[in-house]
């Protein structure tokens, strides 16, 4: 026997001898959370004690249409159907989710109980109760997650909707930052506020601006933690970059202040590291900005009569975009459809009506000159209005007011967002497109990929969700967040999505036509494939992403993921805070009840 083989055989002997002992050694059972009816589930007395600790705010949670299951003709069922198109009504229900599910992904399922938290003490009591009793914990403010992250069956829900107070500051200094961080105008808000609450207080009433989301009923806390882009992000950056301070409750049940001077790692993770993963946010303070005199818009829709004409249209548009729109003034989107349709739905900041019109006139003139190639279905135009009235319901033709008795007078949603309310998703995907694709030599690759993809499914290019072209300060601030740095190099976020109207459990509607729904889901994948061909390692926006993305860590956070994981392990080593494809979720079963690693 060769010496090497002899040594290998000798080295193996102790292992062989130990094998029976190792095989017989008992393995620790994986950590499992408890469900109702299982040993360890809290007794009625324990739930009553929790209710007392949180001031009587503990609720049993019902699904949105539970009243219809017990009494299809009753007032509760009629009320649910009458209001299901109202995003504020949905958000006001503890069991409500802004989308009604996702094909083969998730279905809304109510928590067992919810704490309608009034303050951080209520939240801390709920967090400690869940930790000590091995309960699945869910957190909901706005409930807007496409991924269903605020919906978890058999869980205890921390519901922050009632924590919606808004306070303005002329010169805010984060706690412990005196002499280190200069005072700044800011707004503080409870975690349950929606962006319309801040826009009303900051812009309509006070004449300043806060960077938030485009959809008015999105929760403030969730958007900031996801990174957060709004219509005017090309000018002001991400919502996360505007976070000055957060009050949170950690997995240990402690109330902490996170800012640049106190808990700086946690503060950084909260800026785009994903909601529901690091702590329960109870209050946020965001920077406010000088309000431009004008906000504006550009619009129009046309259809090319041939693929050749459509290619010429896209070629001309991207030439025009690169030269005239790739700057802090212009955001929102254009949509490229499978039937050679091209729709403009863009917004501007800092340009008066004359300036906005002059920017677009060369492109509109080109369309007019090539009218034999196109059918115009919505006449193109551009304009602007005083920015202070952008979110003011009075005189608005685009905002739908919440007409329920007792609803805040400023609550309204954009009519263009109506189809998202209660949507049941068949498929969804997004990817950031780097600004290098706008260079003259690269544009043909971009155009061919868009042509190929749009044959399968409509593609929206959301220019405000890519920060390339934004002011340098906005990009620098975004790079100091946990958001994938690819966002700062992208001129747009491409979004492909399909779905149908509400399919909440208990509605009594026929289930989705599975053949059609699966075909739609495949079309989304087929539409994104050509774009991934030119951006093979593309990043994706965590809030608007593919539920089934296998490389989610890299796609959502890029090079920031290892740091986020280390912060997660430090502040929540036992994985109390858990959401689908959230930091650390790879250690858990899909339902969040069994620890795998």
State where each predicted segment sits.
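Soluble FAD-dependent oxygen oxidases
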Residues: 2-18, 22-597
């Amino acid at each position: 026997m060769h010496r090497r083989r002899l040594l290998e055989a000798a080295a193996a002997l102790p292992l062989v001898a130990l094998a029976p002992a190792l095989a017989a050694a008992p393995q620790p059972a994986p950590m499992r959370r408890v469900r109702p009816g299982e040993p360890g589930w809290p007794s009625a007395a324990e739930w009553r004690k929790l209710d007392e600790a949180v001031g009587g705010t503990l609720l049993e949670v019902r699904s949105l249409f539970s009243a219809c299951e017990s009494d299809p003709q009753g007032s509760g069922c009629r009320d649910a159907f009458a209001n299901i198109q109202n995003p504020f009504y949905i958000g006001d229900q503890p069991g409500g989710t802004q989308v009604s599910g996702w094909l083969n992904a998730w279905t809304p399922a109510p928590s067992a109980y919810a704490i309608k938290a009034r303050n951080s003490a209520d939240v801390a009591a709920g967090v400690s109760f869940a930790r000590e009793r091995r309960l699945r914990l869910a957190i909901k403010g706005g409930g807007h997650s496409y991924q269903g992250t605020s919906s978890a069956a058999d869980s205890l829900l921390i519901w922050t909707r009632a924590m919606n107070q808004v306070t303005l500051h002329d010169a805010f200094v984060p706690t412990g930052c005196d002499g280190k961080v200069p005072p700044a105008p800011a707004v503080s808000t409870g975690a349950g506020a929606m962006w319309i609450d801040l826009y009303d207080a900051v812009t309509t009433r006070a004449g300043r601006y806060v960077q938030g989301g485009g959809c008015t009923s999105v929760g403030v806390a969730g958007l900031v933690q996801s990174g957060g882009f709004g219509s005017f992000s090309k000018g002001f950056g991400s919502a996360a970059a505007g976070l000055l301070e957060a009050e949170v409750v950690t997995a240990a049940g402690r109330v902490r202040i996170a800012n640049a001077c106190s808990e700086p790692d946690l503060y950084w993770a909260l800026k785009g590291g994903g909601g529901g993963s690091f702590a329960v946010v109870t209050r946020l303070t965001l920077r406010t900005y000088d309000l431009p005199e004008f906000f504006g818009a550009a619009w129009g829709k046309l259809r090319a009569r041939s693929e050749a004409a459509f290619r010429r249209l896209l070629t001309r548009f991207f030439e025009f975009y690169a030269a005239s729109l790739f700057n802090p003034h212009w955001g929102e989107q254009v949509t490229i459809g499978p039937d050679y349709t091209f729709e403009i739905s863009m917004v501007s900041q800092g340009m008066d009506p004359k300036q906005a019109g002059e920017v677009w006139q060369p492109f509109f003139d080109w369309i007019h000159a090539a009218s034999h190639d196109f059918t115009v279905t919505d006449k193109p135009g551009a304009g602007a209005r005083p920015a202070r009235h952008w979110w003011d319901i009075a005189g608005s033709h685009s905002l739908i007011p919440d007409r329920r008795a007792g609803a805040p007078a400023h609550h309204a949603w954009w009519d263009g967002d109506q189809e998202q309310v209660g949507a049941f998703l068949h498929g969804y995907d997004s990817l950031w497109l780097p600004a290098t694709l706008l260079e003259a030599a690269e544009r043909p690759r971009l155009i061919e990929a868009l042509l190929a993809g749009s044959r399968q499914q409509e593609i929206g290019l959301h220019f405000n969700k890519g920060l390339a072209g934004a002011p340098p300060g906005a990009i620098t601030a975004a790079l100091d967040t946990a958001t994938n740095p690819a966002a700062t190099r992208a001129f747009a976020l491409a979004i492909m999505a399909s779905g149908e109207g509400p399919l909440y459990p208990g509605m009594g509607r026929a289930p989705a036509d599975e053949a059609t729904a699966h075909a739609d889901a495949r079309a989304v994948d087929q539409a994104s494939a050509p774009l991934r061909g030119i951006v093979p390692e593309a990043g994706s926006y965590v809030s608007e992403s593919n539920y089934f993305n296998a490389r989610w860590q890299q796609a959502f956070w890029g090079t920031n993921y290892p740091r986020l994981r280390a912060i997660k392990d430090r502040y929540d080593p036992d994985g109390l805070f858990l959401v689908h494809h959230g930091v650390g979720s790879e250690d858990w079963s899909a339902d969040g009840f069994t620890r795998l690693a």
